[in-house]
C-alpha cells in the first residue's frame, strides 16, 4: 500500500489535501520530511546507512522520512526512528530544531538527546543496512559519505559553537 501524505501550505500548515507518495506534488503545496538526530551524552551521533536499492544508496544519514497523513513532525520523527533504528524516543524528549523549505517539501530537523550512552539499535532491513555511532568531528572528515545537505542542516540547527 502506498504512503498517503497530508499536504502543507507555504506556512507549514496542514491543508487537509491528501496526496499519494510518488505522484508529483502540485505547485504551491508541500509534503513534510523529518530527520531526527540521536545524540548520546558523550556527544556521539547515530548514523544509519541507506539500503543500496534506495536513492542515494549506501550513503549515511540520521533517521529520516516522510510524515504520513495524521502525523505532525514530532510523531513522524518518533515513528521513523523507531522503524528504522529500533530506538524509542519519548515524544516529550524530541526537540524541534528548525526547518528548511524546498521546492515541494519541508525538512523539519529534530534532536533526541539520549540520557544514556548504552543504546542499542534494531535496523529495518528494507531501509537501513548498517548503523554506527560517530563523533561529530569524524563526520566532518567524511562528508562525502553523507546524503547531501544533511550536515549543513545539523550545523545550522543543532551544532553549538
Functional labels for PLM-detected ranges:
Residues 32, 106-110, 132:
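Short beta-strand micro-motifs in enzyme catalytic cores
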Residues 21-25, 95-101:
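Short, solvent-exposed loop/turn elements at beta->coil junctions and helix N-caps
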Residues 33-57, 61-64:
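A glycine-rich, hydrophobic loop/mini-helix early in the fold
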Residues 1-35, 41:
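Acidic, metal-coordinating catalytic segment for phosphate/diphosphate chemistry
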Residues 12, 40, 89, 98-120:
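Active-site-adjacent beta-strand/loop module that shapes the phosphate/pyrophosphate-binding cleft
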Residues 122-152:
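NUDIX/MutT-family hydrolases
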Residues 46-47, 62-95:
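The catalytic Nudix box helix
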Amino acid at each position: 500500500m502506498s504512503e498517503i501524505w497530508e499536504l502543507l501550505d507555504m506556512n507549514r500548515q496542514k491543508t487537509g489535501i491528501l496526496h499519494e507518495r510518488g505522484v508529483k506534488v502540485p505547485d504551491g503545496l508541500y509534503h513534510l520530511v523529518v530527520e531526527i538526530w540521536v545524540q548520546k551524552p558523550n556527544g556521539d551521533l547515530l548514523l544509519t546507512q541507506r539500503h543500496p536499492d534506495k536513492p542515494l544508496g549506501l550513503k549515511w544519514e540520521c533517521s529520516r522520512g516522510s510524515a504520513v497523513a495524521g502525523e505532525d513532525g514530532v510523531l513522524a520523527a518518533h515513528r521513523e526512528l523507531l522503524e528504522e533504528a529500533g530506538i524509542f524516543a519519548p515524544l516529550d524528549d524530541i526537540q524541534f530544531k528548525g526547518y528548511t523549505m524546498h521546492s515541494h517539501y519541508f525538512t523539519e530537523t529534530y534532536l533526541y538527546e539520549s540520557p544514556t550512552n548504552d543504546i542499542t539499535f534494531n535496523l529495518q532491513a528494507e531501509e537501513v543496512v548498517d548503523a554506527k555511532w560517530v563523533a561529530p568531528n569524524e563526520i566532518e572528515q567524511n562528508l562525502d559519505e553523507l546524503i547531501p545537505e544533511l550536515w549543513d542542516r545539523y550545523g545550522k540547527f543543532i551544532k553549538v559553537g
